[in-house]
Amino acid sequence: MIRLISNQTFIEGTTPDIESCSIEDMLWEISLMPIVGVDTETTGFDPFNNRLLTIQIGNRDVQYVIDFECIRHRKDVMIRLNRILQDSLCIFHNAKFDLRFLYRHGIVPKNVYCTYLGEMIIHQGLPYEKGRDSLQGVAMKYLDVYIDKEVRGDIHWKGLVPEVIRYAAKDVEHLEDIMNAQTEIHAKHGLHKTVTLENRFVRVLAYIENCGMRLDLPRWEEKCLADEKVLQALQKQLDDAIRQDPGLSQKYMDRQLDLFGGEQSILINWSSPTQCVKFFKSLGLDLSMKDKETGEMKDSVDAKVLLPQQHLHPIIPLYLDFKGQEKTVSTYGRNWSDQVHPVTGRLHTSFRQLLNTGRLSSGGKAGNGRNQIQLINFLNIPQDNNLRNCIIPDEGKLFIDSDYSGQESVVLANQSMEPKLISFYNEDGGDLHSFVASLLYPECRDVPLDEIKTKFKQQRQNAKACNFAIA
């Protein structure tokens, strides 16, 4: 049975499977449910700019659809609903999305299970058919139930008509059964701790995404201007290198003088990989490298290709400096200030759990079509004080900065039970990468570990690559 909580009384009696319900009855009945499915319908993906339209709460027997925008005393109702849900296990599919909207209205569930995360834990980064971890996919997989998504989005122009209400209710009807089916698989493979951890963590991630980061805009503008000036200077050095080389100037300099008596222009766009490939091939460089996606060989001006050959021509180091600065300007430049949210005044990104690598990631694309943007990666901020000093806490607050020391390597030692690694950590041996280098390279063997980092940088780097290749 579907029970609608709304002041839109015109719906009353129009269909036998949907009945009106008072707020008091809904709150009382939900308080008796130890496990509930929870879902939302919204006008978009942004909890600050978009509106919450409905909240669905229920189980296989009864589903409550709350017409969020058309209930009286909404704030008071949300406070009471939040108190009730504190004692319930709330099951979501893609919990992070719904939690971000619910947090905005004072609903903060304590005990959460996400069937989306539950499914990702089961296939643990292995190749997986696209769409199989959607609600529609897991309902079909475990329950042989088809959830019709054809009416998705109709709520925006039809409102809460019966087919939209049924669609919204369906999203919570089967969540408990899906969770139970997943839990059997988790138990079989000893995944209970992972499931518990990830479902606790998703509550935190939703909160962190809503909090965002505060940016000192005046200081950021100064940084951007300084970075752009450095980039312009590097481009001028590249152009001058062409002008000063008789062979290169003959081929790559426009012989026609500027109408206003300026310098002759250079016929290379240093920001164009295609043009730069042609240029460096003309210098006799080998630009071939394997494409990560196709596995086929291709020409590239990637730093990995050019660095080993930089001794072949003085313009190569200049170009590498230019490309590095260009990345700084494009990745850590005005795109940041452009993404400061008009409502919160902060930068927001998206975090994703349970990647193939086992790590957390952030960033990715947001929006559609021309409005699509590349979100900022909060997990890849350079160790540059000019940049980091622009990220500031609120007035009267401080940042707390913490990090695990060699987290992956500790796990490797624990899982492998390698005696030398275990002994190293039990004795608080210091830098693991230097320790491994001392085992691999004879020249490092009798050198104190704290000196290997400075005296044998390459050997330590090789050892580090070895450690992370395994861990």
State the predicted function of each range:
Residues 56-61, 65-69, 351-447:
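Function-dense linear segments that define catalytic or interfacial modules
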Residues 28-32, 82-87, 393-394:
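Flexible, charged surface loops at secondary-structure boundaries
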Residues 1-19, 41, 49, 172-386, ...:
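Conserved "right-hand" nucleotidyltransferase catalytic core of DNA-directed polymerases
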Residues 104, 123-127, 144, 184, ...:
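Short, well-ordered loop/turn and helix-capping segments at boundaries between secondary-structure elements
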Residues 2-17, 46-187, 195-199, 205, ...:
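Active-site-proximal helix-loop-helix substrate-binding element of RNase H-like nuclease domains
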